[in-house]
Amino acid sequence: MRVCVIGGKLQGVEATYLAHKAGWEVLLVDKNPSPPAKGLCDLFYQVDVTGEKEFLPICRETQLLIPALENQKALDALHHLAQKHALPLAYDPLAYGISSSKLRSDKLFMDLALPVPLPWPKGKFPLIVKPSGSSGSDGVRRMNSPEELESFRLSQGTFDGWVIQEFLKGPSFSLEVLGSPEGYQTLQVTDLEMDASYDCKRVLAPTALGESEIKRFEEIALTISKGLDLRGIMDVEVILHEGQLKLLEIDARLPSQTPTAVYLSTGINMVELLGELYSKPSNPAVSCPPSPRGVVYEHLKASPGKLEISGEHIMANAGPLRLWENFFGADEAITNYEPHRAEWVATLIITAESRKKAWKRRCGVIEQIRTSCSMSAYLDPSPANSPSHQKS
């Protein structure tokens, strides 16, 4: 099968990696000349998808279009083109339109009576302030006092377009749902760990959540899917605060990071399932194995004398990445590493029979990198008041 991935940033890296694991050929399209996924694809086209004349011939060479971008103008152009020419596009514009706005998605959560952080002013300090239209940790700020919040308001001129909620302490978790109104399937829960700026630095599988919490998480995800009439895939993120799961955000698109961890832990390939969903009349059948493998998936930044674990933002501007096998003992790495480079970044992918064994392997990989590259300093920052693995 030949697929076209539109967008070569981190979602594009994810889609390309998993498409290759499915045995597919990947044509990558991006308007920028050197996106991260360029080093992973089979063919690259520097094309602006809003220009139909250039883009349509590429579409006709493929059996599936996978959007891996958040530019609304480009997404609208893709949807229009797919409707006009009957092209298979893995995109649900209505669900994405809600999930791409934190204000609209929070309203949906409240309409569905789902547990969410208290909005300000009901929620007390400290608060989290985040832009409605950005995904993940982009633009997220913590406010510890009324004075900080007022200073922020003055700098912005308004609170319009911002979500302001109580700051909750606790571990974060992710779960994907896939399907259509005919039926939905939850996949595997993964555990998320953040850097100091609340950007996800590490994904762990299988989850440390108990069975009752997993079941509750699945119920929440299925309720949202039905509320959206989702057709496609959606990522749901929650935080476990004082024994209760609270919804943080949703994204009705192929996410980055967690799909690879789920694939390596369970063998479930979300990109392959998307292909089945958009090319066959019935929903794909999915079953999780009884004994998933342990996975550690994390990002690191190397500089002279120092190795630092960091959020995925470090990968976005690293230029074309490539896939290395047996990278300092890791199963795989997606990286711009070269032996002569003093500064480089990598996403480490490490598996074992269990999560505990995968973590032990990961610590050995970190030590091997530090020894081989003469790095005496090691940092693994986390948000204040959050647990973290500080030592390898």
Predicted segments with their positions:
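A short glycine-rich, hydrophobically flanked beta-strand micro-motif that places a catalytic Asp/Glu
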Residues: 230-242, 380-382
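Peripheral (often C-terminal) accessory segments that flank ATP-dependent C-N-forming ligase machineries
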Residues: 275-392
